[in-house]
UniProtKB/Swiss-Prot annotation:
Gene that encodes the chain: E2
Any one GO BP annotation for this protein: DNA replication
Keyword Phosphoprotein: yes
Residue span of region DNA-binding domain: 294-377
Alphabetic keyword roster: Activator, DNA replication, DNA-binding, Early protein, Host nucleus, Phosphoprotein, Repressor, Transcription, Transcription regulation
Protein name: Regulatory protein E2
GO cellular component: host cell nucleus
Purpose: Plays a role in the initiation of viral DNA replication. A dimer of E2 interacts with a dimer of E1 in order to improve specificity of E1 DNA binding activity. Once the complex recognizes and binds DNA at specific sites, the E2 dimer is removed from DNA. E2 also regulates viral transcription through binding to the E2RE response element (5'-ACCNNNNNNGGT-3') present in multiple copies in the regulatory regions of the viral genome. Activates or represses transcription depending on E2RE's position with regards to proximal promoter elements including the TATA-box.
Similarity field: Belongs to the papillomaviridae E2 protein family.
Length: 377
């Protein structure tokens, strides 16, 4: 017993010295795991001899010391192969060569330069999880170590080796565990990466991907139904769209440069009139006709939290594609949908079309295009 106690004291003293030294050399960390391995051997032998204590230290069960000893052997041999590679002379901290780091995703790889990313599930800041994006990853390939770069996209955290992507964190699977829908946002500092649901819609409601084409049964379209031109004549009521900018000079004849759009009588965005009013018409006879403008708008409809997240993303990434965005609002009528609304305004139809061609909406957010007749004072 005295011999085991003496050897154990020497081993633990070496461990304390290594911890205090806090070296960045790989050889020191290999020595650290050798000491842990030797400590497990001594404790295992002491338990076999029937000892429950060595001084003030409790002797663990045989299975505990055996398992920990096997782990120490694994780490020692792994670090020795890393030492003999091209990366053996790089600075390595004790934390980077720890067992915990070895088993942190991606497992059985060494990693450096970790950065925390936040994933908000269901567009809800209160339902967020943090993950570590490793920018440098060391992967063992057959008989040698390979240094690769870590990446991040909407799907998850991954690295590329041999031309193949290996995801070690899949955000879709995480969304199934922590969210109520397959929708999430990845926040990296001030940058936001959208979930696939925000990039490509598969539901029947609209996803902004191009100019909208109307069907005979609905005012919304799917991504596959979007076309590059608007229909000139349909079974719906067709009216002439006004020029979108207020004329600076005398009124001009717009008959030769008229855009035709189809608007459903029941779903007009302009609540004051079911039809679109051209600039040459003004219901207020006491004012100059030139001051009446029909402003192009897009009305978004969906869950209030999703709309708030979307509005924040629009201001952060696409603020040049629209003029203004309203706060989240609702109709007060009791027989209307409980969905929230956000209204976007544009300088002209060209800016609105550029917005529709560029921005992608979450699948549960629909939109309607139209005009809002404003009386400019």
């Amino acid at each position: 017993m005295e011999t085991i106690a003496k050897h154990l004291d020497v081993c633990q003293e070496q461990l304390l010295e290594l911890y205090e030294e806090n070296s960045n050399k790989l050889t020191k960390h290999i020595q650290h795991w050798k000491c842990i391995r030797y400590e497990c051997v001594l404790l295992h032998k002491a338990k076999q001899m029937g000892l429950n204590h060595i001084g003030m230290q409790v002797v663990p069960a045989l299975a505990v010391s055996q398992t920990k000893g096997h782990q120490a052997i694994e780490m020692q041999m792994t670090l020795e192969t890393l030492l003999n590679s091209d990366y053996g002379t790089e600075p390595w901290t004790l934390q980077e060569t720890s067992r915990e780091m070895w088993l942190t995703p991606p497992k059985y790889c060494f990693k450096k330069q970790g950065q925390t990313v936040e994933v908000k599930f269901d567009c809800n800041a209160d339902n967020a999880m943090e993950y570590v994006w490793w920018k440098v990853i060391y992967v063992f390939d057959t008989d040698k170590w390979v240094k690769v770069t870590g990446h991040i996209d909407y799907k998850g955290l991954y690295y590329v080796h041999g031309g193949h992507k290996t995801y070690y964190t899949n955000f879709e699977k995480e969304a199934e565990k922590y969210g109520n829908s397959l929708q999430w946002e990845v926040c990296i500092g001030s940058s936001i990466i959208c979930s696939p649901a925000s990039i490509s819609s598969t539901v029947q409601d609209v996803s902004i991907a191009g100019p909208a084409s109307h069907s005979s049964s609905s005012t919304t379209t799917t991504l596959a139904q979007a076309s590059s031109t608007l229909p000139i004549g349909t079974a719906e009521d067709c009216v002439d769209a006004p020029p979108c900018k207020r004329p600076r000079g005398p009124p001009t004849n717009t008959n030769n440069a008229r855009n035709t759009v189809c608007v459903r009588n029941s779903d007009s965005v302009d609540s004051t009139n079911n039809n679109i009013l051209p600039n040459s018409y003004n219901s207020n006879k006491g004012r100059d006709n030139n001051y009446c403008t029909a402003t192009p708008v897009v009305q978004l409809q969906g869950d209030a939290n999703c709309l708030k997240c979307l509005r924040y993303r629009l201001h952060a990434k696409y603020k040049t594609l629209f003029v203004a965005a309203s706060s989240t609002w609702r109709w007060t009528c009791s027989d209307t949908s409980s969905n929230a609304l956000v209204t976007l305004t544009y300088v002209d139809e060209q800016q609105r079309q550029q917005f529709l061609n560029t921005v992608k909406l979450p699948p549960k957010v629909t939109y309607k295009v139209g005009y809002m007749s404003l009386q400019l004072l």
